[in-house]
Amino acid sequence: MRILYKQPGQDPRSLVIPNELKVMQQLVGGRIETLRISDNGILVMNEEGKLLGLEENFYFGAIGDTIVGPVLVVGEDGEDFASLPDDEAAEISQIMRGGFEI
């Protein structure tokens, strides 16, 4: 599935990964936590990122908080993760760069 991946201090980039929990856990460095950030976009992050003191990644104005550690954004198909649509990827990428807020 096509995702958007962002590590702290780096620009977001598009990746293609298998739709597997283990792969997502490897990318975020631990157990995952999800947060809906748009109609079809779901942010996947490390569940214990703040407790572990992971590096700040970007400020997310819609929740008034800073997201820490490496993150990925996936789309959804019903109850399953899926490829992130291109239009959503472009908008979310801009947010992660600090361009505007949802």
Q: What spans do the regions from the language model cover?
A:
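Domain-length accessory/inserted modules outside core catalytic folds
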Residues: 1-102
